[in-house]
Amino acid sequence: LGAGLVQLAHLHTSPNSQAPVPALPEKGGKTRHGIIPEELFQILYPKTGVTGPYVLGAGLLTYILSKEIYIINHETFAAACMGTVIIYGVRKFGPDVAAFADKLNEEKVQKAQEVKDLAMTSLAQAIQDEKKEQWRAEGRQMLFDAKRNNVAMLLETNRRERVHMVTNDVKKRLDYQIALQTLHRRMEQEHMVNWVEKNVVTSITPQQEKASIAKCITDLKVLAKVQQAKTTA
Amino acid sequence: MTLSFFDQFMSPTYLGIPLIAVALTLPWILFPTPSARWLNNRLITLQGWFINRFTQQLLLPLNLGGHKWAALLTSLMLFLITLNMLGLLPYTFTPTTQLSLNMGLAVPLWLATVIIGMRNQPTAALGHLLPEGTPVPLIPVLIIIETISLFIRPALGVRLTANLTAGHQLIATAAFVLLPMMPTVAILTSIVLFLLTLLEIAVAMIQAYVFVLLLSLYLQENV
């Protein structure tokens, strides 16, 4: 059992570390005429030049046909037809299919990129907002001063109100005293006038009354005479 | 000469090894394994896209019980389409031209749908034998007809075999008579051969699809 445990501990371990995963090549291997790898041409170039691989191909073909290693039979024609169709299909629709596959990958990347961009913009916005808040916080002294001014003004207003109130109250009391004094004086004056009048009326003796009435009658007669003279004239 | 025309469909053996086993399993290397990467090369991307779309479309009419068959149906579709398309290349052997293979695929799968239907919902499964709205006098005849139609469903396999065999045979015959022909007449035969090639490509894909589609239809009825 111990040996088995040792083996179990060595599962899924290897000395090669594949992390991070090696990157894939961007493009596939280069080919000439779609089928033949470019490396063949590079290998043969030093010895046989540019036409080397073509001569090799033609020679191989001729050899195979002439030695009847490959016999031309009905399958050759079927192969020619099928080959034409396949090559036509690949040449015509190949780029579209490749573009489609690339588009699928692009969309995948774009979705992730959108998420990342959204996160970035929201974080940048958060930074902006934070900076603004810090700037706002700097102005808090002004805020405190304004508030302090407000409070002082309120207190001042209150104090002045109270002063006015006190002034009014005191004035009211003084007015009351004045009114009281004037009332007193008026009453005294009225009383004195009444007393004088009463005394005067009681002091008028009957003979003085008669004399004054006689004077009034003579005055009236004179006035009547004057009036008569004025109307006749 | 008839025997030589059908020679292309003889199951090939080499030194006693049935090469059909190789023909059945080797196309698997054409499909790259989906890698652990997030962004893949074009082949894996297209393969993944195709498999996803196909499975989604196939499972649309099926309810949840039928979704268990998703892996089976999609892999069957890929299998058949690969075998058919590869068989169009010259000097290749198409395993799906063998009746034994196609019946071996069709009969067990069809029987599975029937047994599932009979086991889980026998009333509904038997109810499929009588379509709705049939006039009363026709009922006995119709039940017999529907039962026959039920048991003929393994013709799924026969359909595939027949279509592919016929297509390959036509191409072989047209190419064979093209060989010793005069050039002027040969042009017409070449056109025929070219059109047959196009047809065969279409048929190869369509027949695989029809196989899987009908199977999913039988499943939909019974699951």
From Swiss-Prot, chain B:
It is a multi-pass membrane protein. GO terms for molecular function: proton channel activity; proton-transporting ATP synthase activity, rotational mechanism. InterPro entries: ATP_synth_F0_asu (IPR000568), ATP_synth_F0_asu_AS (IPR023011), ATP_synth_F0_asu_bact/mt (IPR045083), F0_ATP_A_sf (IPR035908). Its main location: mitochondrion. GO terms for cellular component: mitochondrial inner membrane; proton-transporting ATP synthase complex. The chain crosses the membrane at residues 12-32, 69-89, 98-118, 132-152, 165-185, 197-219. Component of the ATP synthase complex composed at least of ATP5F1A/subunit alpha, ATP5F1B/subunit beta, ATP5MC1/subunit c (homooctomer), MT-ATP6/subunit a, MT-ATP8/subunit 8, ATP5ME/subunit e, ATP5MF/subunit f, ATP5MG/subunit g, ATP5MK/subunit k, ATP5MJ/subunit j, ATP5F1C/subunit gamma, ATP5F1D/subunit delta, ATP5F1E/subunit epsilon, ATP5PF/subunit F6, ATP5PB/subunit b, ATP5PD/subunit d, ATP5PO/subunit OSCP. Subunit a, of the mitochondrial membrane ATP synthase complex (F(1)F(0) ATP synthase or Complex V) that produces ATP from ADP in the presence of a proton gradient across the membrane which is generated by electron transport complexes of the respiratory chain. ATP synthase complex consist of a soluble F(1) head domain - the catalytic core - and a membrane F(1) domain - the membrane proton channel. These two domains are linked by a central stalk rotating inside the F(1) region and a stationary peripheral stalk. NCBIfam families: ATP_synt_6_or_A. This is ATP synthase F(0) complex subunit a. It comes from Oncorhynchus mykiss.
